[in-house]
């Protein structure tokens, strides 16, 4: 369990620290208005949703070994984005729409690493349940929340006052490389599990996904459309309230990372 716990903790820390770091980096380029942070959050929320969808499709459609292969390629490709410092070529020009420029800038700067980090929580928890049958993954979920909170609290009080932006970028990039190593260690038992399933005559991805379902999966009823709609509505409402509160604080006080994180 230790390797999965450390991997999920580090990924959650990096996932939430890169948000204020990137926003702080590009803030002066686009005039310092509250809309800059809103555009950043739009990008991060889209990639977060995409990461969850990727994890679901990966674990429900591909064999265990194929999952490791596909995810390994994705993780290795994401290293090409390091270090994550935005290039000056992305600075806006007069009359250009800032939203599209910000989205393209973020995609070119942190897109792949952020997407990989977004996949880690659900993917590693699923891999953990397969390789550790009978052990609950909910402690890993709680640990990811701890890592996220620590990242948000440490940035305005520790990293931003002490390190330059360049040093922050390099520190984050080094820690991301460490995360890649940890993710590889988590993939090893899944690879061995896939080999054992093939030896047992379970070869296809869907067949392996069915055979790896836990007893809890079988007992859990499928949620109704009303329940899923309520989940979607509540999630959207919380995001809207978060952005509205953050924007109002930035308008009334100042556009600084601490106020982005506070809500």
What residue spans do the PLM features occupy?
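Alpha-helical transmembrane segments of multi-pass membrane proteins
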Residues: 1-263
């Amino acid at each position: 369990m230790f390797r999965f716990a450390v991997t999920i903790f580090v990924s959650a820390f990096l996932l939430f620290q890169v948000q204020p770091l990137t926003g702080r980096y590009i803030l002066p380029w686009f005039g310092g208005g509250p809309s800059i942070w809103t555009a950043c959050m739009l990008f991060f929320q889209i990639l977060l949703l995409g990461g969850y969808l990727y994890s679901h499709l990966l674990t429900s459609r591909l064999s265990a070994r194929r999952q490791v292969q596909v995810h390994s390629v994705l993780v290795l490709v994401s290293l090409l984005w390091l270090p994550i410092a935005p290039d000056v070529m992305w600075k806006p020009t007069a009359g250009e729409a800032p939203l599209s420029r910000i989205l393209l800038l973020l995609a070119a700067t942190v897109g792949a690493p952020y997407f990989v980090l977004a996949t880690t929580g659900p993917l590693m928890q699923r891999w953990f349940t397969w390789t550790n049958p009978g052990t609950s993954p909910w402690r890993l979920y709680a640990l990811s929340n701890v890592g996220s909170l620590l990242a948000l609290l440490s940035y305005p009080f520790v990293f931003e006052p002490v390190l330059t932006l360049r040093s922050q970028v390099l520190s984050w990039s080094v820690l991301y490389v460490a995360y890649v190593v940890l993710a590889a260690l988590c993939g090893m038992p899944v690879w061995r599990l896939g080999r054992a399933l093939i030896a047992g005559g379970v070869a296809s991805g869907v067949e392996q996904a069915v055979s790896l379902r836990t007893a809890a999966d079988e007992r859990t009823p499928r949620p109704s459309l009303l329940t899923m709609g309520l989940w979607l509505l509540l999630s959207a409402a919380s995001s809207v309230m978060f952005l509205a509160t953050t924007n109002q604080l930035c308008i009334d006080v100042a556009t600084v990372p601490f106020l982005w994180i506070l809500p």
